[in-house]
């Protein structure tokens, strides 16, 4: 019988084992993710007989619309995966639902994610991610500060805040620092998604009071696929 729970630091070893099987075995990447970024996120796991079989993680994010004085707290969902030997049991879907329900009970306004491939559009729609936004890649360049060879989290965040009054940004700048070190960032604007079956999109699960129109023309910056 699967059991679902908020992950503890002790669970990271089991989550990492899933990542190594499903995503990457690159040690420098995994070291930054699990030592610097994951402790600042919330992860949820499914266990069977004490073994972690499926996991999902969420980064704390904030939606800001400076022109309208609107600010909403939410999460970016990533790292959804199940050990291959447990495929077919719908454990990932159950873990996603558990994690989303926990965050919604805590009062979060939205959770967004990006299907790794378009064939998963319907999968996430069935899990309540029904507000679809088309991604438009954005060429966003920041000049490093004088004397620096790379962008710092502060310079990137300052540039985003200066140029995009409507945006999603990290609640903890240390997450951004880690992602920059990994060179793991993509930049996008988003518009309404008219044909979600055909378009690559961001999917959002929100509480009932929030419409997808709120997120139209929002600037997104998040980890690369």
Language-model features, listed with the residues they occupy:
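Conserved GNAT-fold acetyl-CoA-binding loop/helix
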Residues: 16-35, 166-178
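Conserved beta-strand in the GNAT
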Residues: 45, 51-61, 74-81, 112, ...
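Conserved active-site tyrosine of GNAT-family acetyltransferases
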Residues: 123-129
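Conserved acetyl-CoA-binding loop-helix of GNAT-fold acetyltransferases
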Residues: 82, 88-101
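A short, internal acetyl-CoA/4′-phosphopantetheine-binding micro-motif in the GNAT/acyltransferase core
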Residues: 77-87, 225
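Intrinsically disordered, low-complexity, positively biased terminal segments
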Residues: 142-225
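Conserved catalytic-core motifs of GNAT/GCN5-like acyltransferases
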Residues: 63, 112-114, 130-147
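Conserved GNAT acetyl-CoA-binding A-motif
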Residues: 96, 103-116
């Amino acid at each position: 019988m699967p059991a679902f729970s908020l992950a503890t630091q002790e669970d990271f070893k089991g989550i990492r084992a899933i990542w190594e099987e499903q995503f990457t075995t690159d040690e420098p990447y995994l070291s930054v993710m699990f030592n610097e970024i994951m402790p600042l996120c919330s992860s949820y796991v499914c266990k069977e007989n004490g073994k972690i079989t499926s996991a999902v993680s969420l980064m704390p994010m904030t939606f800001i619309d400076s022109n309208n004085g609107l600010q909403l707290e939410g999460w970016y969902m990533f790292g959804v995966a199940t050990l291959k030997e447990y495929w077919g049991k719908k454990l990932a879907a159950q873990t996603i639902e558990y994690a989303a329900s926990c965050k919604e009970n805590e009062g979060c306004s939205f959770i967004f994610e990006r299907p790794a491939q378009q064939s998963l559009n319907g999968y996430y729609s069935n899990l309540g991610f029904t507000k679809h936004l088309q991604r438009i890649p954005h060429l966003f360049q920041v000049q490093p500060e004088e004397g620096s060879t790379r962008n710092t989290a502060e310079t990137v965040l300052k540039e985003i805040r200066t140029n995009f009054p409507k945006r999603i940004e990290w609640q903890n700048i240390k997450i951004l620092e880690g992602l920059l070190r990994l060179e793991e960032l993509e930049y996008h604007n988003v518009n309404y998604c008219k044909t979600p079956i055909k378009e690559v999109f961001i999917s959002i699960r929100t509480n009932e009071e929030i419409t997808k129109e709120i997120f139209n023309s929002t600037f997104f910056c998040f980890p690369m696929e």
